[in-house]
Amino acid sequence: MDQTQNTIAGIGEINGSIKTEINAIATVDDSNEKLNQIINSNQKILELLHQLKLTVSSFTPASQLHLLQRLNSLVMELDNMAKLSDKCNIQVPIEVLNLIDDGKNPDEFTKDVLNKNCIAKNQVTKGKSDAFKGLRKHLLEELEQAFPDEVDRYRDIRASYAAEAKRLAQTQSVLPNGDAKVKSEL
């Protein structure tokens, strides 16, 4: 394959990946559009139910036609929402539905799930960090028995590096973890 063919093949691969990304973005936009249509349909249904309640609460034989029109509008909107829901695939955990049935805020479920996941990941990370600290300590103890002079030099180098990093961080308004301090403007 010559240089021109390589270039054309490379461009084809780039175009293919761009098309894939565009299709993925279009799919997300399409899903959001469908979800927005369902939300709008829900709002219309709530509005129609409210109007229907008002019509029924002040019902007179003369308002029967008006009541039937509102009932027909509600049925049409429910049918529209059913059609829209077939196009939109949203999975809601049963726990969220149970919370709603119990009159609780479904955001609590999301908060609990995120907290549990974060706590679990933090514990795993802390365990790994503690294991590495223990390994480092054990290695230093073993090295100190075998090479005491080298370990002393290593500790001196680490101490001077830590002092320099701390001094540099203080002069540059950088936190020890590498984050920059941000001054709040009031």
Swiss-Prot record:
Gene Ontology MF: a single term: transcription coregulator activity
Reported effect, residue 88 to S: Loss of oligomerization. Loss of oligomerization and dimerization
Spans through the membrane: none
Keyword DNA-binding: no
GO CC field: mediator complex
Pfam families: Med10 (PF09748)
Biological-process GO terms, alphabetical: regulation of transcription by RNA polymerase II
Subcellular location field: Nucleus
Record's keyword terms, sorted: Nucleus, Transcription, Transcription regulation
Predominant place of localization: nucleus
Keyword Transmembrane: no
InterPro entries: Mediator_Med10
Biological role: Component of the Mediator complex, a coactivator involved in the regulated transcription of nearly all RNA polymerase II-dependent genes. Mediator functions as a bridge to convey information from gene-specific regulatory proteins to the basal RNA polymerase II transcription machinery. The Mediator complex, having a compact conformation in its free form, is recruited to promoters by direct interactions with regulatory proteins and serves for the assembly of a functional pre-initiation complex with RNA polymerase II and the general transcription factors.
Quaternary structure note: Mono-, di- and oligomers. Component of the Mediator complex. Interacts with GEBPL.
Family in the record: Belongs to the Mediator complex subunit 10 family.
Name by which UniProt lists this protein: Mediator of RNA polymerase II transcription subunit 10a
Species this chain originates from: Arabidopsis thaliana
Name of the encoding gene: MED10A
